[in-house]
């Protein structure tokens, strides 16, 4: 699949969402809401569910599948209260010893005036800091777009995976082309230079695993992700805490 098709597929409105994975993978998934400071952000969803006999905290960025739903979800662009909700749930997981799984699909954090006034940069930076030392295993999965700091704020993890037809980048190809050449129409040319596809990032050791989507139905893909999570969470849970945190630290220091 060429780069243009991969970008289109990553942005496809019918693509599986965080809630699709959360309800399909985890038994008795219960959503939790709000950051306890300002309001609930529909762009970030999270809660607790069971993976076998293991309770897991699930957090992710949610895009809509219709115009009305996208308006509710702010087209998957979180406000600072969304990132603060995510952090609240992750600290709750740490307190009770639950591993964390994050699902990421965003073009980036919302850049509006109100979001900046409420501390968008601080909220993202705090998540990076807190996740780097969170004392439970973390697995992050990019399921569509992984855009800029808005994606990284949920991706400081022990393992970072990508679905095969997803992308992960410092900014959109359109933004890159506009900055570099003052011509947004050269977006796909920019995408080739940026190395944003799953297999390119796996080769550069930015991500740890690519989950194949070829020939799989939605149910089969969810089942595949569930199996991978069960195996990897069991492995990570056996690591001594000091080793887990040191490996996470070194994983990001190497860049």
Swiss-Prot record:
- A Pfam family matched by this chain, by name? ACCA
State the UniProt keywords alphabetically. ATP-binding, Cytoplasm, Fatty acid biosynthesis, Fatty acid metabolism, Lipid biosynthesis, Lipid metabolism, Nucleotide-binding, Transferase
Q: Give the top-level enzyme category.
A: transferase
Q: Name one GO cellular component term.
A: acetyl-CoA carboxylase complex
Q: Give the chief site where it resides.
A: cytoplasm
Provide the E.C. number(s) assigned to this enzyme. Answer: 2.1.3.15
GO MF annotations in UniProt:
acetyl-CoA carboxylase activity; ATP binding; carboxyl- or carbamoyltransferase activity
Q: Where in the cell is it found?
A: Cytoplasm
Q: In which pathway does it act?
A: Lipid metabolism; malonyl-CoA biosynthesis; malonyl-CoA from acetyl-CoA: step 1/1
Which reaction(s) are listed as its catalytic activity? N(6)-carboxybiotinyl-L-lysyl-[protein] + acetyl-CoA = N(6)-biotinyl-L-lysyl-[protein] + malonyl-CoA
CoA carboxyltransferase C-terminal domain ranges (all copies): 1-235
> What's an example Gene Ontology biological process for this entry?
fatty acid biosynthetic process
Family indicated by similarity: Belongs to the AccA family.
Q: What does this protein do?
A: Component of the acetyl coenzyme A carboxylase (ACC) complex. First, biotin carboxylase catalyzes the carboxylation of biotin on its carrier protein (BCCP) and then the CO(2) group is transferred by the carboxyltransferase to acetyl-CoA to form malonyl-CoA.
Tell me which NCBIfam families the record gives.
Answer: accA (TIGR00513), AccA_sub (NF041504), PRK05724.1 (NF004344), PRK12319.1 (NF008971)
Q: How does it assemble?
A: Acetyl-CoA carboxylase is a heterohexamer composed of biotin carboxyl carrier protein (AccB), biotin carboxylase (AccC) and two subunits each of ACCase subunit alpha (AccA) and ACCase subunit beta (AccD).
What name is this protein filed under?
Acetyl-coenzyme A carboxylase carboxyl transferase subunit alpha
The protein's organism comes out as Streptococcus pneumoniae (strain CGSP14)
